[in-house]
UniProtKB/Swiss-Prot annotation:
The organism of origin for this protein: Xenopus tropicalis
GO molecular-function terms, A-Z: DNA binding
Gene: tmem18
Protein name: Transmembrane protein 18
Perinuclear space side of membrane: 1-20, 65-84
Family per similarity comment: Belongs to the TMEM18 family.
Keywords per UniProt: Coiled coil, DNA-binding, Membrane, Nucleus, Transmembrane, Transmembrane helix
Membrane topology: Multi-pass membrane protein
GO biological process, one term: fat cell differentiation
Amino acid sequence: MAEDPGLWTLLERAPIDWKEPWLIGLAVFHILCLIVTYVSFKSYPLQICHFLLMVVLVSCAEYINEFAAMHWRSYSKQQYFDSSGMFISLAFSAPLLCNTIIIVVHWVYKTLCVMTELKTLQQKRKESREKRKKKE
């Protein structure tokens, strides 16, 4: 039985010229988005803006795909943008959605931490009230 090819093998076999400047730029863009996602953990307003910007970009992917399909000759050696939008979904939207998922997971984690802290404070207040009642 044949072994399943790995992700890198599939990427190498794909008819995509990964050395095209715009694809390198797209990769750099996604790396920068990941860095901003990490840095934004320290700044809630930055994180919200970054999250919303990525959601808007994913929402506009269909329009970006149509525009790129009409003008691909001006920046690319071959046409990657088909009517189904598979390439833009994988190369553009999926990494952005991964970043948004990271942010949502961070928000859930922070919420759980705050809820735990709140419950701990409630328990401490309850215990201190009970101690005061016993003293009276």
